[in-house]
Amino acid sequence: MPSKQIRKQSVILTRGARKREEDSGTDVGEGADDWAQSKAAVRPPDQLELTDAELKEEFTRILTANNPHAPQNIVRYSFKERTYKLIGFVNQMAIHFSQVGNLIPKDSDEGRRQHYRDELVAGSQESVKVVTSDTEILEEEEEPKEGEGEGEGEAEGEAEAGSQTDVPAAAETTEKVIEEELMAPVQPKERKLTNQFNFSERASQTFNNPLRDRECQMEPPPRTNFSATANQWEIYDAYVDELEKLEKTKEKEKTKTPVAKKTEKMAMRKLTSMESQSDDITKVTQAAKIVERMVNQNTYDDVAQDFKYYEDAADEYRDQEGTLLPLWKFQNDKAKRLAVTALCWNPKYKDLFAVGHGSYDFMKQSRGMLLLYSMKNPSFPEYMFSSESGIMCLDMHMDHPYLVVVGYYDGNVAIYNLKKPHSQPCFRSTSKSGKHTDPVWQVKWQKDDMDHNLNFFSVSSDGRIVSWTLVKSELVHIDVIKLKDEGSTTEIPEGLQLHTVGCGTAFDFHKEIDYLFLVGTEEGKIYKCSKSYSSQFLDTYDAHNMAVDAVLWNPYHARVFISCSSDWTVKIWDHAIKTPMFIYDLNAAVGDVAWAPYSSTVFAAVTTDGKAHVFDLAVNKYEAICNQPVVAKKKNKITHVQFNPIHPIIIVGDDRGHITCLKLSPNLRKMPKEKKGQEVQKGPAVEIAKLDKLLNLVREVKTKT
């Protein structure tokens, strides 16, 4: 009974204690909640208050490899140049933590070798300890024990006799153990080999030792004054003396036969004669070139006088008419019966122009030629290059006038360097480098790219306009745009649609807006395109009913361009208006058109009937002020025309390979007349205003109609 009461009391006590703990816990918890609710955030008075939208706005963080703590203006002294130079490249590497480790994985070959070596070392140490402990025990047993009396009697004598018998046996065992240890072969330490298949390299940056100049004193070398003349005969005599010395040394040698000596002498004589001939030929060619120019100057002296000074006096009696005076005629027998397919003046040498020869008869394609003529020598070209395929177009670089880019009938493009004498192009496209699949109709040099690499564009009948860049002596191509006829599509039985590809024939880039250019096609349409957009055209003009032969921006007015076609028409456009401003019918297929460099209203066109037409909109807006046949035979077709950038002359080429130079009469190049007390205004602004005045009249008429 008493034990049961004790148990009941303990249970009651424990229940009461638990209840008190729960009550105390609830009180503390409630007090903690009240304290947490009454807590307020402390904010500074100038803190920004952002809205929910601003708080939810995400900001992107960009990680860069640049070290913000790296110095930007390090200047070091260059002992080589003896000046302080700014260090352009600064090391951007920042090391946060570096530790050299010496741990080796246990499973690797090196770890196993090291574990094996440690075991060998530990085993040898234990064996030495065992031997030393045995010897120490034996020595202790040999020493007499202290505290023993001297008078022990017979028992002591027997013990000593027994110990004396045991000592030699123990000594023999220790000596055997030591001999075995010494006679055992010592294993050499295994050399640590590097793992050729699992290793890491650690790079370190070392400081380049600066160059230092060290001076020392020495005796000056002896000096003598020497003077001699170096000319052709002195050099020849020196070579002859050297040759005689060689012959004397060969005569002393007895091993060689006299026949071998004679052959060597003949070979040496041939080499010296060939060298002298090559030097003489180069000098003769230069002298012959000078003499040829002198002879031509005397032969064509009357033509040169007309080119420089003659002015047609009959223009005073003709108000709105002019004439073309024939000057020189350029032709070459090697380019006979090859049509003139391209003309271009050199931007630096104004008397030099390039001619491309090919064939417009596509059923009878032949070779091509690139010729460069000078007005100083009309009888023979200055440079001559031949090609297997016909040349269809060319252009000369503005900054590098010795570089000529050409386009071939087979779709290739090539660059010729006039400084190099060989006849092959320096750079040429191939089928692997993205050449055109149809004839290349026009090429144009453009500004260099960001890396100062040469750059030019080409257009072809395959519908591609390609940008070519000369990178590391190689032509790299990029398709800028592909011409697609938006209106015409053909359906395939499978349900697919094929877009008709436009055939590009001509293009021209804007003089001020670098990315803007025009493209003419065989379908008669003109597309306004941009270098930045390769998928669509900026504008489309339904210009002609037949192929567009040429399209050119006006050299003065930024909004005006001209086009000509085989449909007998020449049209002048404002690129902001889809209808032409002026239309001229020339009663024959127009092969080419060109703006005059001296006026914004003058242009020339050539037709297949052998006539050249010169227009001046400021004089007559409706008709040409000069219609003149410039080829002898009616069957000859004029293909191209070009104005000289400085002189008042034009050059025209026909399909027989002839180039004719013509001088413009004063009525074809009229300038503003001087008025009393007023200065004549000149410059691009005057030319722009003159053309704007004509265009405004046409715009007013169109708005009224």
From Swiss-Prot:
Protein name, per record: Dynein axonemal intermediate chain 1
PANTHER family xrefs: DYNEIN AXONEMAL INTERMEDIATE CHAIN 1, DYNEIN INTERMEDIATE CHAIN
Region (Disordered), start-end ranges: 1-44, 122-169
Comp. bias regions, Acidic residues: 136-159
Function: Part of the dynein complex of respiratory cilia.
Entry keyword set: Cell projection, Cilium, Cytoplasm, Cytoskeleton, Dynein, Microtubule, Motor protein, Phosphoprotein, Repeat, WD repeat
Phosphoserine: residues carrying this PTM: S124, S127
Predominant localisation class: cytoplasm
Subunit-structure text: Consists of at least two heavy chains and a number of intermediate and light chains. Interacts with BICD2. Interacts with CFAP45 and CFAP52. Interacts with CFAP53.
Recorded GO MF terms: dynein heavy chain binding; dynein light chain binding
Source superkingdom: Eukaryota
Pfam families xrefs: WD40
Compartmental location: Cytoplasm, Cytoskeleton, Cilium axoneme
WD repeat ranges per the UniProt record: 386-426, 435-478, 543-583, 585-625, 633-672
Any single biological process term in GO: cilium movement
Gene3D superfamilies listed in its UniProt record: YVTN repeat-like/Quinoprotein amine dehydrogenase
Gene name in the database record: Dnai1
Biased composition range(s): Polar residues: 124-135
Cross-referenced InterPro entries: Dynein_IC (IPR050687), WD40/YVTN_repeat-like_dom_sf (IPR015943), WD40_repeat_dom_sf (IPR036322), WD40_rpt (IPR001680)
Membership in a protein family: Belongs to the dynein intermediate chain family.
